[in-house]
Amino acid sequence: MTDLTPREIVSELDRFIIGQNDAKRAVAVALRNRWRRKQLADDLRDEVYPKNILMIGPTGVGKTEISRRLAKLARAPFLKVEATKFTEVGYVGRDVEQIIRDLVDNAISMTRDHMRDDVKANAHQAAEERVITAIAGEDARESTREMFRKKLKAGDLDDTVIELDVADTSSPFPMMDIPGQPGGNMGMMNLGDIFGKALGGRTTRKKMTVSQSYDILIGEEADKLLDDETVNRAAIEAVEQNGIVFLDEIDKVCAKSDTRGGDVSREGVQRDLLPLIEGTTVSTKHGPIKTDHILFIASGAFHIAKPSDLLPELQGRLPIRVELRALTEEDFVRILTETDNALTLQYTALMGTEEVTVSFTEDGIAALAKIAAEVNQSVENIGARRLYTVMERVFEELSFSAPDRAGEEIIVDAAFVDENLGALAKSTDVSRYVL
């Protein structure tokens, strides 16, 4: 669980997302409230429920990017799902309880990684012993083992090929598709789970170099030192107390006002989400999970539907509303210059692999931003994603001929942008289809 302050969370998000301060602040406060709740006494902690968030804003302004960056900051079980993937319980397709099952699976792998770090020193020692045994043999003297241990630590044996018995991770049972259940096991028991324990301990003999064997052996030895029951218990606790679910495309499950009957992949999904967001118990193969304290952040463009088209009960369960504004030309300039993952840096690095040096001038960046903003206004506003189309068009010729132009230096200024894009941008009819 992260202990960053709201100010630190916002400044971390600022590195990748331009503007949208309201959304960043709401998310930062929600994340900090998780930490605050942990500091409370047990009886009061159970009474403090998370305030779920609804982010509303046009496409391409940073809603999904906020969730992606938040996942890295949260250090808590985190899952991002699209609401459009689900159908009402009882119909073919995934039901919303699968969200919690996936969240638990994420938490278990995250908890196992953290716990592996705690036992890494002991696991490293055990892995070293297995490598020495594989090189020197089972009945080697202690002096011989010691000699090999010194060589091993010095790195002299890294390229030596050894044969080892390692755990066979392949399942002896083929995956079976259950009709009407895409993905087969849908979070419930599959044959591998049922018989895996009984047939456990299967090993396979593999040849590998000493340096390759370390990662596999350390993982195996760490797993031997970890108790599955403890890992599962810690993961379930983390999900129930600190879990965060990001529900994208929530506007796509709004029923159109003129629709007759309950649409199974729209209103039906909303009805199923109600108890999940309010707090219910979901059965998983690792045990029941209470969703009372899981934080839900929903987001949608609400391009066609309105937030008021959501079921009133669902609106009530998303009390914090945040509006994200559309991006302007100035924002595009900042996106191309200030972010840590700016497209300008990406294209410079990509062309650098072909030994072509690319540099951007201020007027070149201004021209890119101006064209992106103009096309957004005249055709369809798709936000920052328009920069991808514009940049790809500008670099189309250079990307194709880069291998033949090694050693050249390309300056992307207003003239370069105009030469590669000018005619397209001026003709609205053409830009409608091409950009």
From Swiss-Prot:
Keyword ATP-binding (UniProt): yes
GO biological process terms, semicolon-separated: protein unfolding; proteolysis involved in protein catabolic process
Alphabetic keyword roster: ATP-binding, Chaperone, Cytoplasm, Nucleotide-binding, Stress response
Q: What's the superkingdom here?
A: Bacteria
- UniProt key word Chaperone: yes
The protein's assembly and partners? A double ring-shaped homohexamer of HslV is capped on each side by a ring-shaped HslU homohexamer. The assembly of the HslU/HslV complex is dependent on binding of ATP.
Q: What is this protein called?
A: ATP-dependent protease ATPase subunit HslU
- What organism is the protein native to? Roseobacter denitrificans (strain ATCC 33942 / OCh 114)
Q: Which gene encodes it?
A: hslU
